[in-house]
């Protein structure tokens, strides 16, 4: 490495110009020369990146020699110092490929705007470690003026978009097949503007001699603007891919097409025993819809989904050609170290081979069974995380706690019921001291719940339709809570209109925070959240099957709706216990809840159910039949005693859970499977849930255009549907997103 740095210094002196030196070392741009002619809004940005590179504007003054000296003395992270041989070997390969260059510190100091950040080494599973720069520690990330288009980063919902396409695929054309294509060398495909490169300098670990400085010639790992700049390229390619598929363009063969058909060395086994004989997606797509042909991308991982053999071939060809449109393929005059844009190594490993069982974005997907599970290595990692926090442990470093929360959050989608267990774990961060957190009994109770969920995963994988709402809700309702009690109404096909209510015990009523009782321990929002949970339990026991079906409910308390939707709140109060109860209830019954706000003045039916305690049960039914008449008479549905006890216990901060909701390893039946459960209601049995007005309508005839029109009272399912936010399919920003700035 030192010999290379000395040669690079000599070459720089011979050029006498930093820009000429960079362009020579980097070679031809990887972005295709024809990008400016692409039928896409981002064409101008990509052409700019090809011609000039990504800029690195900073909002602070250049570093002086003293600060550079302090950064040099500080050096790299311990992870890099502990593996100097690997760092030198890896950096030397990067220099040969034109991604980095290395200079002695004395030469690098001549470059204007030089800054030095520490280098780290991150281990990776089944791959060699990765070099990453800590630009946050040096302040470069905070000082960077954000010019890259943030709307290019669509990868946050890639999994939801893919699952949404799968569950809505037309079953007439068979199961959905999946494939992957990886971009080789990732961020290093996008060059930097030569004059800005010294701002991203890196101090390398050395054992002796003059310190060495590494300078990135392309987007480095760790810089805050690298993801949006790079995804502006890959997302454009993905848009071109889907445009080809939408317009039914004929796609010619691709040179890598045969290599992409290489089967994997090991065929994945079914992720669990819970597998129906036939797909359970029978009513999720119109019978006239064409076979699925879709592509998406997560940073540099292209995901392909298709049904028939013909469409699988079209999607594969379209993906390969679309990538070539934005990242030029290999040319005869390229340097020997340059790789094809598509990772040939991954193709040989079978990544692009079409299969119904595939590891996608760190999840094992089975499109025949319609399930999502944690791969074995991630499940082992989950146990490793939990084992690191035995009940005898009293404190933990803050960094370790953040790592635990981050990894548990990343696994929560495949852990049914896990979303409601984060409230206590997050609350620990509010009480941190001296970069350490204190671990309490409540924390270990939550970790025990996580372990119980992990133990049940073999027989309890997550169904796609537990995550993606499909079709109209099978029931609509509204609920409310007051100091005296809680109640609500439900409308569902095949059932009479239901009203329910339950009175809070005096101890709960006395604990409510009011203007006269400021020392209370329960807020009205907590009671509203309790009512929401009880409301769903009433429906779950009234209908024969709610599994994997959307249900819609409205409430007039925004805080409780937000907690129920998110699944957690940073707290150890009653709401933490309620959210745990809410998550385990959804885990048990597997419905897909949709929560919406309704104005308090319009929520009259739920108000009466929760407040009219001057009426007996019979008088309440008479009141509803006369005030809110429906096609059939109202029925008073009781709240099961087990749920009432659990709600009161949670409000009292007790971990009381009904036996039916406890985490076990018993396989659950599959709706629509081979006799293992009740079939979901047919499309013809759905109730009308079409939204006929906006959530907050304004009067067109009012003297002031901002004056709200009088809110209509919600006295029927049609009135409630006015407040429903329509559920739409997760979609990409197609046919194209456009940057707000040039670069």
Task: Write out the residue ranges for each language-model feature.
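Catalytic-core region of right-hand nucleic acid polymerases
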Residues: 79-82, 86, 91-241, 245, ...
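Reverse-transcribing Pol proteins
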Residues: 1-151, 416-450, 726
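RNase H-like nuclease fold core
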Residues: 468-524, 538, 544
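A conserved non-catalytic segment of reverse transcriptases
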Residues: 122-123, 212-217, 296-297, 327-415, ...
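Charge-rich, intrinsically disordered N-terminal extensions
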Residues: 674-743
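Catalytic palm subdomain of template-directed nucleic-acid polymerases
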Residues: 139-149, 190-191, 257-335, 366-372, ...
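A short, polar/acidic, helix/strand-boundary loop motif
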Residues: 210-233, 494-530, 559-576
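RNase H catalytic domain
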Residues: 306, 536-604
């Amino acid at each position: 490495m030192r010999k290379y740095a000395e040669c690079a210094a000599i070459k720089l002196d011979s050029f006498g110009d930093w820009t000429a030196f960079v362009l020579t070392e980097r070679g031809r741009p990887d972005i295709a020369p024809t990008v400016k002619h692409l039928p896409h809004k981002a064409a101008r940005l990509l052409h700019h990146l090809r011609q000039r590179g990504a800029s690195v504007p900073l909002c602070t003054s250049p570093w002086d020699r003293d600060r550079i000296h302090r950064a040099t003395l500080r050096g790299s992270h311990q992870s890099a110092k502990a593996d100097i041989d690997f760092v030198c070997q890896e950096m030397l390969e990067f220099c040969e490929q034109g991604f980095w260059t290395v200079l002695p510190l004395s030469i690098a100091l001549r470059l204007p705007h030089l800054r030095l950040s520490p280098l780290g080494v991150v281990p990776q599973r089944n791959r060699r470690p990765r070099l990453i720069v800590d630009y946050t520690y040096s302040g470069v990330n905070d000082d960077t003026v954000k010019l890259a288009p943030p709307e290019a980063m669509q990868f946050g919902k890639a999994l939801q978009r893919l699952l949404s396409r799968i569950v809505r695929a037309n079953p007439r054309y068979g199961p959905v097949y999946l494939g992957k294509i990886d971009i080789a060398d990732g961020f290093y495909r996008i060059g930097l503007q030569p004059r800005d490169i010294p701002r991203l300098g890196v101090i390398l670990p050395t054992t002796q001699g003059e310190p060495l400085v590494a300078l990135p010639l392309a987007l480095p790992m760790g810089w805050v603007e690298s993801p949006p700049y790079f995804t502006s390229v890959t997302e454009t390619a993905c848009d071109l891919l889907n445009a080809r598929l939408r317009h039914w363009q004929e796609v010619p063969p691709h040179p890598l097409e045969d290599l992409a058909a290489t089967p994997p060395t090991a065929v994945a086994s079914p992720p669990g025993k819970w597998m129906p004989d036939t797909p359970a997606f029978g009513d999720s797509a119109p019978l006239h819809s064409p076979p699925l042909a879709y592509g998406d991308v997560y940073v540099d991982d292209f995901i392909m989904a298709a049904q028939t053999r013909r469409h699988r071939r079209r999607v594969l060809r379209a993906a390969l050609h679309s990538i070539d449109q934005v990242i030029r393929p290999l040319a005869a005059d390229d340097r020997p170290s340059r790789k094809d844009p598509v990772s040939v190594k991954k193709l040989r490993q079978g990544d692009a081979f079409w299969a119904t069982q595939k590891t996608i974005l760190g999840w094992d997907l089975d499109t025949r069974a319609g399930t999502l599970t944690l791969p074995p290595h991630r499940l082992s990692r989950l146990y490793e995380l939990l084992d690191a926090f035995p009940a005898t442990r009293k404190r933990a470093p803050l960094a370790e706690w953040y790592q635990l929360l981050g990894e548990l959050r990343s696994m929560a989608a495949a852990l049914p019921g896990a979303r409601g267990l984060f409230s206590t774990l997050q609350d620990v961060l509010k009480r941190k001291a001296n970069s350490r957190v204190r671990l309490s009994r409540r924390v270990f109770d939550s970790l025990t719940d996580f372990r119980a969920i992990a133990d049940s995963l073999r027989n309890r994988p997550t169904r796609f339709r537990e995550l993606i709402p499909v079709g109209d809700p099978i029931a609509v309702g509204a609920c409310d809570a007051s100091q005296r009690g809680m109640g609500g109404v439900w409308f569902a096909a095949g059932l009479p209109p239901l009203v329910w209510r339950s009175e809070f015990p005096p101890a709960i009523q006395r604990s409510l925070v009011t203007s006269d009782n400021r020392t209370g321990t329960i807020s009205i929002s907590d009671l509203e959240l309790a009512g929401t949970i009880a409301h769903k339990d009433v429906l779950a026991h009234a209908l024969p099957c709610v599994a994997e079906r959307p249900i819609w409910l409205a409430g007039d308390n925004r805080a409780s709706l937000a907690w129920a939707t998110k699944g957690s709140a940073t707290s150890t109060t009653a709401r933490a216990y309620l959210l745990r109860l809410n998550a385990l209830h959804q885990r048990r019954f597997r419905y897909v809840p949709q929560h919406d706000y309704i104005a308090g003045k319009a929520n009259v039916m739920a108000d009466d159910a929760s407040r009219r305690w001057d009426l007996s049960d019979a008088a309440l039914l008479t009141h509803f039949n006369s005030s809110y008449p429906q096609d059939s008479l109202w029925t008073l549905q009781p709240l099961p005693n087990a749920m009432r006890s659990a709600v009161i216990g949670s409000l009292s901060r007790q971990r009381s859970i009904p036996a039916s909701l406890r985490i076990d390893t018993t396989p659950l039946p599959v709706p629509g499977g081979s006799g293992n459960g009740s079939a979901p209601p047919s499309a013809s049995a759905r109730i009308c849930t079409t939204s006929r007005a906006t959530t907050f309508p304004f009067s067109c005839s009012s003297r002031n255009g901002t004056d709200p029109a009088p809110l209509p009272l919600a006295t029927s399912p049609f009135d409630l549907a006015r407040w429903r936010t329509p559920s739409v399919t997760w979609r990409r920003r197609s046919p194209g997103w456009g940057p707000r700035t040039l670069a």
